Amino acid sequence: MGTPVSEGPTVSVIIPARNEEASLGACLRSLTTQTGIPYEILVVDDGSTDNTRAIAQSFASVRVIDPGPLPEGWTGKNNAVTAGAHEAKGDWLLFTDADTVHRPGSLAKAVAEAKQQKADLLSYSPEQEVCGFWERAVMPVIFAELARKYPPSRMSDPASKLAAANGQYLLVSRKAYDAVGGHAAVASSLLEDVELARIIKAAGYRITFRYGGDAVRTRMYRSFQQLREGWTKNLALLFPSAIALALWSLIEFAAVIACLVFAASLVIAGDWRHALFYLIVPFLTVMRIATSHFSWSSNLLGILGLPIFAYLLLRSKLSYRIGKVSWKGRLYGGRTIAAGRLSRRGTVAGHS
């Protein structure tokens, strides 16, 4: 179980939770059985209207925190994690989502890895669990594009200005977190994990980012509606050239389908040699998608995910343009989005 606060936790695990009754129990079961390091667990109940608070309170070693009213210009998550950090007593802070499940011993290993890498921020991209057509088709495409846009090797390189992190698993030293102002420094950002990594790296601290399927797994979305809302919030911020990327995805999809049709017609005609030539484009597309750590069946479905990815990119871009983005039952617009844009301009300058 989690080490009591009185014993001096090395790590404070902070979980913001808003209506997470479907996943919080599994998350806490995986965290309360961690071994090898003193730690505490704090769940910040961000105005849940379901059984989230009751589930958290059912774990004796878990502290449940109320973040208080949402200040003007703040996002709900940033307010919640700031409240958690204020109550935390650890030398390290692990911000993790309620829909994550942590491998046995992963907490101690993560802190050891951060120290071995001399990193003040360690972030893992979890193994993504996907079910059903929409998740299996769309998620591999998005994560392949993320791997291209934000290569972990460059983010972990102190000589590179590129920086990003995944808020599903973000371990940061208390020293670095407090030095840059914590989440209060990115209070208005809807992409707080990336923004926090940028300001921490810009302040001279080292970050390490990698695929972390050996440490943590998650299922981000459980319906197409959740998937659409979540990526609408994120994609335009992750990919500033969202319109161009959407057009390219549609072109790639059209090229793949055309090549498959030509290949099929040649096979029917008995011309296998030229049919194989037309399969080069679909093969290269699937191999690119395969960099995202999904199953081969999901990578193949990713071909059908290309136009859906384009739709989500355009929807995200339009939502930010009109100033209305919703997440977890809250509508963000006007000052919050404008402030987030200004924050992002200030931190992106000089980054590729």
Residue positions per predicted region:
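Short, acidic, metal-binding catalytic loop of nucleotide-sugar glycosyltransferases
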Residues: 29-38
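Acidic helix N-cap motif at the loop->helix transition within catalytic regions
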Residues: 22-26, 50-58, 105
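Membrane-embedded multi-pass helical conduit in multi-pass membrane proteins
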Residues: 252-322
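Cell-envelope/extracellular polymer assembly enzymes that use nucleotide-activated donors
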Residues: 9-12, 40
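A conserved acidic beta->alpha catalytic loop
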Residues: 30, 45-54, 69
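Acidic donor-binding/catalytic loop of UDP-sugar-dependent glycosyltransferases
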Residues: 51, 98-113
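Long helical/loop segments within the catalytic core of UDP-sugar-dependent glycosyltransferases
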Residues: 66-86, 109, 113-179, 235, ...
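Catalytic donor/gating beta->alpha subdomain of glycosyltransferases that bind UDP-sugars
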Residues: 114, 121-147, 175-178, 183-245, ...
